[in-house]
Amino acid sequence: YTGELGRKVVGMLDTSRSRLHRATGSVYAASLPYASRIISVWSGHRPEDRDRIDSVAFARGIPAVGVELLPTSLECGPAVVPGRTACYRCYQRRLHQHRERTASLMRAGAELPEGFAGGEVAIAAGFIGQALADMNRGDAGTSLGGEVRVFDLVQGGLHKYETVAVDRCERCGSRYDRRRHPTAAIAHLV
């Protein structure tokens, strides 16, 4: 987590059995402690950090989700479960494909000062709880997974949608499963 929003959201969650990592700058793979799940919380849009976290989640085979406070919305997701859902990179590609105006607003939001009320903190904590429940669901049923929850801060609307993987994605596509296996690099030696 980072910033005041991250600190307050983490304060609302049961973190007694968690490892907390306060990011003071960019997030890199080596700086992330091993955990059973990775949850990121911050103000602004930080796609490079989210993508690095997602790549660590896929490399370690653990679920990940992030919450971002943007100028007009509070977004949680996608809830990524390696081997079951689309990755963050696919989410970014779909976002740019369908909502270029929103993507430009997100880029602008990274430079704005952090500002939020207690309601946004509670909604973010609730979104994380729902994302964790999604991750723990053993059977995805008819769900595509990669759920994204968005609370519109202007109109007060709540939206939920799922992320569809991009064809031939090297991170989450089933075509590349064998290359992503932890021992793939040394498999020919055994």
Regions found by a protein language model. Name each.
Residues Y1-V190:
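Adenine nucleotide-associated cytosolic modules
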